[in-house]
Amino acid sequence: MSNIHKSLALRRTISSSAFTMFMLVAMVGLFSLFSIWSINRAWIEGTKHTVQMDSLSRAALDAQVSFKVQVQEWKNILLRGDDPALLEKYLKSFHAHALQTQENISQVKLEASVLGMNDLASEAEKLVDTHKSITLRYETTLVEAQAGAAVISATVARKIDVSLRGVDRDLENSIGLFADEIVDFAIQERSSLEARMQDRYFTLRWFIISVIGFSLVITAYVLTRALRATRT
């Protein structure tokens, strides 16, 4: 009978140990699967937002570049406007980059609105209006000074330059600061995403390590009981 009792006690101990280990493994597995799913979902959503911010920053930087080129082409008009062919060439380029600047800033406005960044969208809208006003002022001044002539003389070019000198400076600075602000936003979003993913990874890792340690302790305890049961 004593051997039978020992055998039953050993079986109960082994069964209890197996059940405990099964529950621990199942718990670790389920939590790990949920954590991986959660991390993956957060990563996908965060990456999507980061990509949108990168697109926003590229549009702002493109607007900054295209406006600088537009201003440079205006200077070329004044410097080389005494040649009809060059005047036509630089006028076309001036208008093309003016349109490109408008499109880039408008894209920033649209994407900022989609992201719920209403302050940036409002700021972009103001830049669009200011740019339109300055471009129109360039064009009107040129037409009036040119007075139907096929070229721009050096004297006329100097008068135009004096009347419009520095008119682009505030807008260029505003677009530059605007672009820098958006780039900083994009960098912060990327850094925040990386930090969140790192925190979740560390949480999952330490949980698994803790459960494994706890499992080893439980296993050692159950095995100790099993050994004692075989000796009594």
Residue ranges and their predicted role:
Residues F19, M23-L30, G213, V217-Y221:
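Generic alpha-helical transmembrane segments of integral inner-membrane proteins
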Residues S55-A59, T155-D170, Y201-R205:
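Individual transmembrane alpha-helices with interfacial aromatic-anchor signatures
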Residues M1-M23, M197, T203, R231:
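Positive-inside N-terminal membrane-insertion signal
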Residues L33-I39, I77, A220-L227:
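Transmembrane helix-loop junctions and nearby membrane-interface residues
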Residues I14, F22-V69, P84, E88, ...:
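Amphipathic alpha-helical segments and their boundaries
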Residues Q64-V71, L91-K159, D170, S174, ...:
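Heptad-repeat alpha-helical coiled-coil/4-helix-bundle sensor or tether segments in soluble regions
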Residues E189-T232:
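Selective recognition of signaling/oligomerization transmembrane alpha-helices
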